[in-house]
Amino acid sequence: MVKKKFEGIRDIFKDDAVKFIILMGVMSLLADMTYEGSRSITGPYLAILGASAVTVGFVAGFGELAGYVVRFFSGHLTDRTRSYWTITLSGYLINLIAVPLLALAGSWEVAAALIIIERVGKGIRVPSRVVMLSHACSQVGQGWGFGLHEALDQIGAILGPLIVAAVLFFHGSYQMGFAFLLLPAILAISVLMISRSLYPNPHD
């Protein structure tokens, strides 16, 4: 009985759809480490650079607004072109590269622009990524597939701020915190490229 259950679990993880979901989940874990780690310190960072509390709130709110507005157009473009990987990769590149660049911001204006750009990047890639995931999840169970992906995603969301907190504790530098996030950003993009190479047409 135990052997049969083990073989059943093993067979599940041999499925290409499950492998794709796991790869995208690992990528999301690394991506969340990057931008959630960043978001945990952007407020104090803007304040240190000279931004007022009102400005910090405005930048955060406008960034979210811009990201959601972009999703509308990105979703429409995804439906028209079916260029799922191109749109997803473009969004992640913008989304993830903006984070470590915050280490080089010499003024709150530059930092604010990068924060908004990061949110826009997320808005670009969300619809196309969700479409690809939905195709994979439809083959293994929508709830289970999305649950697996979201579990990995949320692990990254927890680890990111914790890692940044550790960097600040030992180095006391916001710039060092943002610079350190370059590592998970590069790893996330690398996993995304591997996923594209292995599954060029995940919607088929």
Predicted regions and their residues:
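Helix-to-loop junctions at the C-terminal end of transmembrane segments
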Residues: 70-83, 168
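Symmetry-related core transmembrane helices of the 12-TM Major Facilitator Superfamily/SLC fold
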Residues: 176-193
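Flexible cytoplasmic inter-helical loops of multi-pass small-molecule transporters
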Residues: 2-4, 196-204
